[in-house]
Amino acid sequence: MRNSNVVLAVVVTFNRLDELKVCVAALKSQSYESLNILVVNNGSTDGTKEWLTQQSNVIVINQENLGGAGGFYTGMKYMYDNGYEWLVMMDDDGIPDKNEIKNLIQSYDKVVSAVGKEVILNALVADKDDKDYTAFLWARGSKRTNKILELQKERFFDDIHPFNGTLVKRSVIDKIGMIKKEMFIWGDEKEYMARAVHNGIGLYTIPAAIHYHPKEKGKKGNIIPFVSKYQILVK
């Protein structure tokens, strides 16, 4: 296929049918038209498989529960084997803003030109219940903030919260390979981003691209800038 404009959005799901319905509806409403949707169903037992059989314009892969890592590996492999140029990854409890994918794609070449290297881009993860604030507290220099408008003063910045609206280009996969499926549900996104940084690939958030997510997932602690953290991991 190798259509440079087509994006494959991959959603990994396990027993969260209500959230999945909202996520898929948001993807179907994206302003970016050259978009295909793939749902990787990790052995759900809550009616997800049956609901997916009724959906039009959604590619479905049903598999045993291989965790988030196994789900995203399956999605990434499908993207690569079927010739897509772009991949956007998200969990089933996230909701992409209607312009999320368009803003990520339109930002890609601009960021590459500004930083002089290949990149992985991420949407800004907003609190789905209070859309003026992010789902995670951000460290910007000596300041900490969760205010969307304050963060949107920058065109992009170099921290990310991966697999919440994460854009990966085919050339990045050529360079660093696939997600490690054996990691199941722990650390797969961190390991993949560490591998990216170790191979000279930048990680940047695009504040104009918004991905809504439950705030409680961000209560584990304040954000640590991913670049510094990953440099420690890959030594």
Could you tell me what each predicted segment is?
Residues A26, N41-E50, G94-I95:
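A conserved acidic beta->alpha catalytic loop
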Residues A194, G202-K235:
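Active-site-adjacent helix/loop segment of glycosyltransferases
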Residues T166, V172-G177, E182-A209:
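A short, conserved alpha-helix in the catalytic core of glycosyltransferases
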